Amino acid sequence: MRKAAAAGIILAGIILVAGGLDRKGGSDNFVADVQANDETTQEEDENISSEETTLAAQIDTSAQVTAGSRIAVVSKATDGEYWKLVRRGMEDAVKDINTAYDFSSDDAVTMTFEGPSDEQDVETQINTLDAVIAENPTVLCMSAGDIESCQAQLEAASENGIPVVVFDSNVSDDELVAAFRGTDNTYAGKLAAEKLVDAIGESGKIAVFSAQEKTESSQKRVEGFKEALAD
């Protein structure tokens, strides 16, 4: 769970420079937390705490950050330990950035964190996106509860010159996304299938249950899982 907080910290840094990214989106601006390797090393896990505590010292203040920038985060959910850690990590990162750039009062970078309490409540997330976009934030950051349902909101953000950073669960039209921060979910699904096969052998009946069939992350994990079993 510490990785969730670390991801939030890194994400906040990405958001603040999103204005300098290619707003047409594309794979060049997409970052995965889990890459196609066989295992995460113990050394990587041990480095997470130090990454969390040394961000302020690592911030390159030569990068242009507009004073008074407003980051609007619309999460897939706000309840649950994972989302609370993501929020805490992002809030800590904003504090570190304000310290590094000596921003205060009206110059300070600010962040709001909103969304439904339940990840399944897509309607509330869409309504929240509408309200947030109407406030014209500097950057919109979101984790999509439904891969397709927020297309109109993404188009509205683009029309109003609001760069969009997506984290955790992506959207179908990545041309409207400036950057993505998340897991290689296809690989994660393949890894889960490989571990299961190691445990049960090469034959048997397997049932796959997906808690969130409309999210990109769940779809990719199931896809990767099935691909690994078919190989």
Where are these regions (language model features)?
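A residue-level marker of the well-folded mature domains of exported/periplasmic proteins
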Residues: 2-231
